[in-house]
């Protein structure tokens, strides 16, 4: 991804009732149906975790919502706009936390962020205004590393830089796809605190994908459980458990082992979800 990709001038639009409104989202690759009617609503300022095992369709869903992949069916409203595939004009008000500094390893952290803020400042990317470099550095805890080359940062520091890049346009909605993959426990805890702090201080809506229930509970106001391309439950883990207390359970295996804390341990309502029981009602 080009960190300096063009963003377009956009007039301030009325605030939509939902930061994200997804209805019947479908995605197929040939005859293989990956998403089979995903429905998801995210209110302004709400943090939602899209929770599910690998292969459930989490990354595909996020890529469609970011405009990086074309859907085959359904309706998507991102901040009130139904984006056309490949059209970046609507992306001026969203943030994507992904590794987007690959060609700039020799740049300092400050140089890269200054370049981005200068690029976006004249384009009015958000009605909330563009962040300055010092604000970004402070927000992600990289003030002390401001003059360090990106290639010299630790893995956790680089991930913080990813967040800073996602915050440049002061977005109203941020997408994070498996944000702590490969982190050790200490780095994971620090990153969790960073995301919670940003959510509290900025009232920014966030959608993050994870297969870790503990992470979802720590970061999100609510979870949406995605299994085999469908949202099978939505709410806090407590409300989901109360609503679906009829005794089935969700669990999944990966690499022949169960996660230390899977959905089955905290949300005892689905057991071995299959195509014969795709929905919970």
Residue ranges and their predicted role:
Residues 149-153:
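Conserved ABC ATPase signature
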């Amino acid at each position: 991804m080009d960190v300096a990709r063009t963003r377009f001038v956009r007039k301030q639009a009325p605030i939509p009732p939902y930061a994200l409104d997804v209805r019947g989202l479908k995605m197929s690759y040939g005859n293989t149906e990956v998403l089979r009617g995903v429905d998801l609503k995210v209110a302004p300022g709400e943090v939602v975790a899209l929770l599910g095992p690998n292969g459930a369709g989490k990354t595909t869903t996020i890529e469609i919502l970011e405009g990086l992949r074309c859907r085959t069916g359904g309706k998507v409203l991102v901040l009130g706009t139904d984006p056309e595939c490949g059209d970046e004009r609507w992306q001026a008000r969203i943030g994507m936390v992904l590794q987007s500094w690959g060609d700039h390893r020799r740049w300092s952290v400050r140089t890269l962020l200054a370049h981005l803020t200068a690029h976006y400042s004249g384009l009015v990317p958000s009605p909330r205004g563009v962040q300055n470099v010092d604000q970004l550095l402070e927000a992600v805890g990289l003030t002390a590393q401001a003059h360090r080359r990106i290639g010299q940062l630790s893995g956790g520091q680089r991930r913080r830089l990813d967040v800073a890049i996602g915050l440049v346009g002061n977005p109203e909605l941020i997408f994070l796809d498996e944000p702590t993959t490969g982190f050790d426990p200490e780095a994971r805890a620090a990153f969790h605190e960073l995301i919670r702090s940003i959510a509290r201080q900025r009232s920014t809506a966030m959608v993050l994908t994870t297969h870790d229930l503990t992470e979802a509970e720590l970061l999100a106001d609510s979870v949406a459980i995605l299994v085999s391309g469908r949202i099978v439950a939505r709410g806090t883990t407590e409300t989901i458990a109360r609503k679906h207390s009829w005794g089935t359970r969700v669990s999944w295996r990966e690499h022949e082992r169960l996660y230390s804390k899977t959905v089955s341990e905290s949300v005892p309502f689905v057991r071995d979800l299959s195509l014969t029981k795709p929905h919970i009602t």
